[in-house]
């Protein structure tokens, strides 16, 4: 018998009849405000990006209040479906965190900023496009990391449905390589310790590059 119990602390409904997957969720301090806790960033296949700042107060009867309208910092409709959301240092000459969003035909990097710079009711947040890259093939997934052991910067790698791996060094395109004996796209992960990419091919073999 476990001594621990799980209980609902905070819940939000993300739209109506929208679809999501695991890569559409990201957690971090997207507002870059040290006085704030981490935000929850959610993107949907309908192209809606939402940013939540969850807080919770306990009532006298021991229950939790849960979601309130001011917990949603941003709701933004994009032109394309959102396949993947990442948070990292994606802009050169800046140590701030930015939101990278993968769409079927492009990847874009955005800045989240509030008019007062504080998490308080009434603060207006906006999403600003920093840059974007058009992809040569429809995308499947992406990863980010300190490729090449670089410090204080995050680079992006996008896997296309044609087996391509396209690398971007922040605002600049770096290069494209193709996975050998490729048939279908699969999971992709970056291993910082070995500075390598790991994937699984269609023969169910784990490959490290």
Task: Report residues per predicted region.
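Beta-propeller-forming repeat regions
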Residues: 1-209
